[in-house]
Amino acid sequence: MGYMIVEKHTSELLHLKRSPGIRSWSILVGIASVGLAAAYYSSDSILWKMFYVTGCFFVALQNMEEWEEAVFNKSKNEIELKTFSLYTMLLTLWKRGHEKVLLDLRHLRDVSVQEERVRYLGKGYLVVLRLATGFSYPLTQSATLGSRSDVEALAALLKRFLGLEELQQRLADDDYPDDDDGIEDLGLGDSSDSQDDPDGDDDEEH
């Protein structure tokens, strides 16, 4: 599974989605199977067997990836990041688990790929949104393992959709004006205009 999939892509809206991959589901099934096996072969009471199954199930959910969405809306000038955690929802009895963050699209200045350590599994990659306010915000809460190319491809898609390269060029032109303008501001014009006629003083004496 790639980093994120494109759910919808128009000239004004880009909708990205991500769901738990095969690794997450494999971990869930594997840890839950350990709990079931412990309960099946154990001679303990029914309460202990339920504890084995429930404990392993929650450990598996804790290590499971989340469902995530990102919506870039040009017409509303906003970025909407949504996260759904099954573990948090069950732990809080459905009171929490859905999180939403709204960012101002006009403050977005750059999109980059960042490397991050993934617990027990090595290094992964994720996209980071860099804002004009100086803050950076990850596009997803967890990094993806494997090839960096999928994450870089998504970052390139975001840059094209939002026109960030053109924006960065305009900002650079505003910060560093043409050299000719700087010379004029210092009062350095044509050197021939500032030189006096060497024979001018002699003519006035005569």
UniProtKB/Swiss-Prot annotation:
Predominant location category: endoplasmic reticulum
Residue ranges crossing the lipid bilayer per the database entry: 21-43
Domain of life of the source: Eukaryota
InterPro entries noted in UniProt: Cybc1
Biased composition (Acidic residues): 174-184, 193-206
Location relative to the cell: Endoplasmic reticulum membrane
Keywords for this protein: Chaperone, Endoplasmic reticulum, Immunity, Innate immunity, Membrane, Transmembrane, Transmembrane helix
GO cellular component: endoplasmic reticulum; endoplasmic reticulum membrane
Spans annotated as Disordered: 172-206
Topological relation to the membrane, as annotated: Single-pass membrane protein
GO biological process per UniProt: innate immune response; respiratory burst after phagocytosis
Sequence similarity: Belongs to the CYBC1 family.
Its biological purpose: Functions as a chaperone necessary for a stable expression of the CYBA and CYBB subunits of the cytochrome b-245 heterodimer.
Record's protein name: Cytochrome b-245 chaperone 1 homolog
Encoding gene per record: cybc1
